Curated annotation (Swiss-Prot):
InterPro entries per UniProt: 4_helix_cytokine-like_core, IL-2, IL-2_CS
Signal peptide residue numbers: 1-20
Cellular component annotations (GO), alphabetically ordered: extracellular space
Family under the similarity heading: Belongs to the IL-2 family.
A GO molecular function held by the record: growth factor activity
Localization: Secreted
Functional summary from the UniProt entry: Cytokine produced by activated CD4-positive helper T-cells and to a lesser extend activated CD8-positive T-cells and natural killer (NK) cells that plays pivotal roles in the immune response and tolerance. Binds to a receptor complex composed of either the high-affinity trimeric IL-2R (IL2RA/CD25, IL2RB/CD122 and IL2RG/CD132) or the low-affinity dimeric IL-2R (IL2RB and IL2RG). Interaction with the receptor leads to oligomerization and conformation changes in the IL-2R subunits resulting in downstream signaling starting with phosphorylation of JAK1 and JAK3.
Protein name: Interleukin-2
Length: 155
């Protein structure tokens, strides 16, 4: 009788230990690669926006984006994911005129996939946004800084 309860207790303990185990090195390496890809995509977008040949930059700067009050953890990636649709719309404005932003849809799609891998499918995190909005360049710079910070803790 007690043997079955003891075995159940041991099984539950093993499940708890396995679920709370630290990330394996292969998972860490994969996370590093995903963060690096997200960082590169953000930098590519920023370079396209800041390109001196971008005739729509002044128009793009009128659009405002929300940024989290304090982005320091992976859960904050949900905030970036929520703003990607707006980012895609703003970047789509000059698409035919700016060679550097022609692959916007593909970049945003790649970022969505990468974000899903990094943050998982859970969307229960509610972002606390800063009271002040940011321009497109401020928005991209803030997320680039966030990715660099997270990436440095992983390496």
């Amino acid at each position: 009788m007690y043997k079955m309860q003891l075995l159940s207790c041991i099984a539950l303990t093993l499940v708890l230990v396995a679920n709370s185990a630290p990330i394996t090195s292969s998972s860490t390496k994969e996370t590093e690669q995903q963060m690096e890809q997200l960082l590169l995509d953000l930098q590519l977008l920023l370079n396209g926006v800041n390109n001196y040949e971008n005739p729509q930059l002044s128009r793009m700067l009128t659009f405002k984006f929300y940024t989290p009050k304090k982005a320091t953890e992976f859960t904050h990636l949900q905030c970036l994911a929520e703003e990607l649709k707006n980012l895609e719309e703003v970047l789509g404005l000059p698409q035919s005129k700016n060679v550097h932003l022609t692959d916007t849809k593909e970049l945003i799609s790649n970022m969505n996939v990468t974000l899903l891998k990094l943050k998982g499918s859970e969307t229960s995190y509610n972002c606390e946004y800063d009271d002040e909005t940011a321009t497109i360049t401020e928005f991209l710079n803030k997320w680039i800084t966030f990715c660099q910070s997270i990436f440095s803790t992983l390496t």
